[in-house]
């Protein structure tokens, strides 16, 4: 009887010791990003997420963030996370459309959802579930990773006065907007962020789209291409966090929750950080860079872009039932939420500007 009691005590002690060890175990993950080490606020979102995860887990979840300068593959983030070369990634979903066209809509679609509308779609309208459905084939989980809000339409060497001025123009513009521009006659290319200024300076391109005043001014595009156009193509550009599914499933449940909360908080932090940065840069741009000519695309160009957008969406939907499901979900959500956007934000601004 005494031996049985001793054995029981030993088993319980071993169990408790194992639980304590498991609780105190440190999990170290590596994350690759598309961004350079100074590309705020994009790189900030990744670094802040890692910081939050470390702090909330009391050091049990440590994430090392590698910028594009480290791994040299800014557009290869999905492949590296899928293969297990990195445990996590931070990029933009539409960069992977060449690998999987279904990833396209999760960044932003031309003439689509605004940032508040898109966040509501992700978390209340089924968008996050559709994102997981698309990334499941890659054995990767994907989450919203920070929004730039409305992006500016780009920097051009010459003024665009009509649709004819776009014919043969060489422009860096990614995502679905690139497909639309190609349809109306633009020679479209995609270039990594760190190479944009050089491409413009060396006449490899005639125009480029980047983000907004804060990030654009720091890149110096205005020194070469003074015509700065307002946006139409990315009303709510959302970055994305990716996690290798096998890695995620090996984390204890509490660390899984801490990780998902860290990503969500870092994403929203980037949105408000970028909004403030753009507002500050816009004031600086108006006072310190009078050579910049801010304007909008002519009505005939906008009409052609909207027509191309409608045609291409139908064509893409016919190619992939899953892509059509995502696009239909966004369209249906716009129909429901846009009425409130008009009644709230639009009318408030209309009456107070």
Label for each model-derived stretch:
Residues 23-118, 128-353:
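N-terminal secretory/targeting leader peptides
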């Amino acid at each position: 009887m005494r031996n049985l009691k001793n054995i029981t005590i030993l088993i319980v002690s071993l169990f408790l010791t194992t639980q304590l060890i498991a609780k105190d175990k440190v999990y170290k993950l590596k994350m690759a990003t598309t961004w350079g080490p100074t590309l705020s606020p994009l790189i900030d979102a990744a670094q802040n997420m890692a910081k939050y995860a470390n702090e909330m887990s009391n050091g049990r979840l440590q994430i090392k963030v590698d910028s594009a300068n480290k791994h040299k593959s800014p557009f290869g983030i999905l492949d590296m996370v899928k293969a297990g070369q990195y445990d996590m990634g931070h990029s933009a979903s539409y960069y992977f459309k060449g690998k999987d066209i279904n990833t396209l809509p999760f960044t932003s679609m031309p003439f689509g959802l605004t940032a508040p509308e898109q966040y509501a779609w992700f978390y209340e309208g089924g968008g996050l579930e559709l994102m997981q459905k698309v990334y499941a084939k890659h054995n990767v989980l994907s989450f919203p990773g920070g929004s730039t809000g409305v992006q500016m339409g780009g920097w051009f060497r010459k003024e665009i006065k009509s649709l004819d001025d776009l014919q043969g123009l060489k422009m860096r513009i990614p995502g679905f907007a690139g497909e639309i521009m190609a349809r109306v006659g633009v020679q479209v290319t995609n270039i990594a962020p760190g190479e944009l200024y050089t491409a413009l300076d060396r006449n490899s391109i005639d125009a480029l789209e980047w983000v907004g005043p804060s990030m654009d001014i720091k890149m110096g595009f205005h020194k070469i291409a003074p015509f700065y156009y307002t946006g139409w193509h990315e009303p709510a550009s959302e970055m994305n966090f990716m996690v290798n599914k096998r890695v995620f499933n090996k984390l204890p449940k509490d660390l899984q929750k801490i990780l998902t909360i860290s990503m969500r908080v870092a994403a929203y932090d980037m949105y408000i950080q970028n909004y403030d940065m753009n507002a500050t840069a816009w004031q600086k741009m108006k006072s310190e860079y009078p050579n910049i000519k801010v304007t909008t695309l002519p009505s005939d160009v906008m009409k052609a872009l909207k027509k191309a957008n409608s045609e291409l969406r139908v064509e893409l939907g016919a190619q992939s039932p899953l892509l059509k499901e995502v696009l239909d979900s966004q369209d249906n959500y716009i129909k429901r939420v846009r009425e409130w956007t008009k009644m709230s934000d639009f009318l408030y601004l209309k009456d107070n500007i």
